[in-house]
């Protein structure tokens, strides 16, 4: 009995030491931060899926208002949360060559070689290749596709609202984003079978994976094990879909001018060239194989589907809660569409300046894809501090923390589109608003995402007004099991046909 006790006690002591071995790292360097919990570090509530990781980082940000940086532990791994905007600007922009890798490494197989997750030279080659596909000139051709899907969506909404004015908004607008993304990316018309398949993929793509926590504890292990954070069911779907579409088009672009057309046109021109060396990186080239194309179409779908649907839902919620703002947007929509004969074009969107301000204020309050991570590629003296990051360590930036900081946004809980008037934007620090990231790794598809949201909102407000319902919540708790910001209770609103 005594022997069992001694062995058990020894085992617990060893495990305790192992899982706390790094927890004096920041204290030894005089960097303040919250006390870590054994095994979990500072993210226990996220690991047990009690609280969204985004809100944990926001709480840490707010707990240390006088600090430029805060020492934290993602599981047992020391990381640095950045609070000071000038420090963030250095890391994300000025010293980007030392921080061009994201915080999670995993296998390039199974869609891992997408532009969002790719690191090093592979990311540089992909960025050089795909950036020209997301210019205003290229995306203008997709506006007609979005608008057409918007018209069909409105007819469906009319039928729903005839039966029941109160609607759960997120699943409703997802029907638009799913149709818009699939037609703009793949040129597909959705049938019931495809809709059912994509609905199943939604939970697989956007449900948090414990692979993230494993990589936090043992950085780089997923890559060493040739493993991914994505479900094994996702890659075959996008691989097969991409292969089928390419075969249907004979491997050549058509006249649709959707994303697949632009990629096939790029492949025909062989537009990928080697990059110059940066620091100790090796120059690489990258062939646009079907697998590489599948990885890009996957991330385009994943990034544009859920984020746009959530942003639209939060935007409509704020319009319902602020009817004076809603009426101002409706007036702008009506007047602008009248000038353009009801057509939604690039000029139409450009002239709806107040709607654009509402869009940005929505993402200020609800940055749906919030956390920014970067890995140091070499030892780095953090500007304005006595802190030195070691090569391979990760920095964390909390968009929620910054967006709710009264130093940058007085009365941050208030929904105020005037924060994004041209004058206010000019006077604000460039890193005080980061819903799409910052620097060269800023979201390539941000213009597409903004247009997709605006097109749908224009279509909806042309026909309806939105009001709170009996189920409308005034505050949101975010689902810790979802990868992005998603309200657990949903968003319910009454959709009321406009009386002209």
Swiss-Prot record:
It catalyses: an organic molecule + reduced [NADPH--hemoprotein reductase] + O2 = an alcohol + oxidized [NADPH--hemoprotein reductase] + H2O + H(+). PROSITE patterns: CYTOCHROME_P450 (PS00086). It is found in: Endoplasmic reticulum membrane; Microsome membrane. Heme binds at residue 443. Its EC number is 1.14.14.1. Its cofactor is heme. CDD domains: CYP6-like. Gene3D superfamilies: Cytochrome P450. It is a peripheral membrane protein. It is an enzyme of class 1 (oxidoreductase). One of its GO terms (molecular function) is iron ion binding. Keywords: Endoplasmic reticulum, Heme, Iron, Membrane, Metal-binding, Microsome, Monooxygenase, Oxidoreductase. Its main location: endoplasmic reticulum. It comes from the Eukaryota. GO terms for cellular component: endoplasmic reticulum membrane. Induction: By furnocoumarin. PANTHER family: CYP9F3-RELATED, CYTOCHROME P450. Enables the insect to feed on furanocoumarin-producing plants and evolved as an adaptation for detoxification of xanthotoxin and other furanocoumarins. This isozyme metabolizes isopimpinellin, imperatorin, and bergapten at high rates, xanthotoxin and psoralen at intermediate rates and angelicin, sphondin, and trioxsalen only at very low rates. Belongs to the cytochrome P450 family. This is Cytochrome P450 6B4.
